[in-house]
């Protein structure tokens, strides 16, 4: 009754792929590609993870599986939500649009920054990512939903960092156009809202800020 569990070839591009079946027989073979890891959840609670490679799912060699055994089946089936998460960098994600209006700390007027460019990112905490994703973009085997969610948090992050920079430097928001290199440097250092979901920004390219 063993099962072969792996990410299907036609879904290799997805940042997160959730295995459709939660009932997993003992001795099933799990294959994790070199650019991803596999996370096990039960009722939305994280239980453990497996690195790249081929794994035989049995409790002797993977102790956390003990928490997933279904006693009602004579103990030969695990109940688990299995997520495959990309751990390699994801490059050249384009972004563009308006931030919410912000009050200029010098002029005391509301201005609306517009930004565009592209960023590269990597998931450094897959558990946080799946927990956040579970609440926001889950179940859709669709990268667009996942990427839109990441972009929303990217914009929130830029807004937070802009606010911090203007407060610290005493500069007007209208000076932001000349501060894009500094701003992208800070985002690479620490992007607040993205850090909450285990994402690190590696680079921002062609970063442009203007005002509508």
Regions inferred by a protein language model and the residue ranges of each:
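N-terminal hydrophobic membrane-entry segments
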Residues: 1-212
